[in-house]
A protein has these predicted regions:
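Substrate-binding clefts and catalytic carboxylate motifs of secreted carbohydrate-active enzymes
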Residues: 2-175
Length: 177
């Protein structure tokens, strides 16, 4: 199938609720579950990862980044995917105003240690990079790019639209973002 980025910009909803973009938990949270050696490989073949996992185990990191053998790099790439998806969804909902009037992701914080999910804060209080991506997407004034997809290959033209999103009550001077 396609990417959520492609599907979302084709939809027109009055609100986007209970969505998410999965990402691995922080290394601190993962170490509360087991030693890194026990978590490898962090996929559906690992009993510990499955017992403490959610749909984040189905992240298509290999599709986007190739085969990753380094544990820290795998976590980083999985979290990057979550950042991109979460930020894109929040920005896309803002681009669809005034028709779309609400955007609310499924899970702000996670109440138990797991290998990954949609949360922005993982158990017990470890902030994931996606939290900051969503915070950036929710700034009052934002230059926002609507790119067509996440993956571009050599020779493809990157195609995107640029929006100036202004939810402040102030008129912005020319040239200020």
């Amino acid at each position: 199938g396609g990417e959520v980025i492609e599907a979302l910009q084709k939809s027109r909803n009055t609100g986007y609720t209970e969505f998410g973009g999965g990402g691995f938990s922080t290394k601190e949270t993962l170490l509360q579950i087991a030693d890194i050696s026990e978590l490898k490989p962090l996929n559906l073949e690992n009993e510990i990862a499955v017992a403490h996992g959610t749909h984040a185990l189905s992240l298509e990191t290999e599709r986007y980044f190739g085969k990753i053998t380094d544990f820290d790099k795998l976590i980083e790439c999985g979290q990057l995917m979550q950042n991109v998806v979460q930020q894109f969804i929040f920005e896309e909902a803002r681009r669809q105003k005034p028709y779309c009037s609400i955007v609310s992701n499924w899970c702000f914080n996670e109440p138990w240690p797991n290998t990954g999910n949609n949360s922005l804060i993982c158990y017990p209080d470890n902030t994931k990079p996606a939290y900051y991506a969503v915070a950036r997407a929710c700034r009052s004034v934002l230059a926002s790019a609507r790119y067509r997809k996440f993956v571009y290959y050599a020779g493809e033209t990157i195609d995107f639209d640029v929006y100036l999103l202004n939810d402040s009550l102030d008129k912005l001077p020319d040239g200020i973002v």
